Amino acid sequence: MKAKELIMVDVQNEEHCRSIVKLINYYMLDEMGQGESMREGMGAKIIHGLRNHSCYIGFFGCIENDYAALANCNINFSTWQAKPLINIHDLIVAPAYRNQGFGLFLLTEIEKYARENDYCRINLEVRHDNYKAQKLYQKAGFSACNPENYFWEKLLL
């Protein structure tokens, strides 16, 4: 079996940027995304935004020369622990690489990175009906918050 490799995203690297857009589009096309392709021009806006977002950190799961998976994350700060934390905003595995351990690989490697850099926790959100993702997250040691939290939003667009 070929070895999986973790690569930190470099938003100044054009190959990385193309791979980010490609992988996000896979997510958008998925039933757990929006079920349709990325809007025209959205890829460039995403890359521009990531390049200008000082708290962005990303991780690719690669095999040979292929970008198989992506975790788009943000660094945040826990005032309760007085330490930084990682929020996983997107976790995407390309359709051709699903059910091959890339999701668990990324989560495990992000945890190693967080421990090595003295982060206090990793958090993420998951749709209530995304049972495959929930199973993966539980396998990686994640659990619902106790007490259970709600994720709320106020759309400004």
Where are these regions (language model features)?
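Conserved active-site alpha-helix within GNAT-family acetyltransferase domains
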Residues: L104, H128-P147, F151-K154
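Short loop/turn motifs at secondary-structure junctions and domain boundaries
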Residues: G49-S54
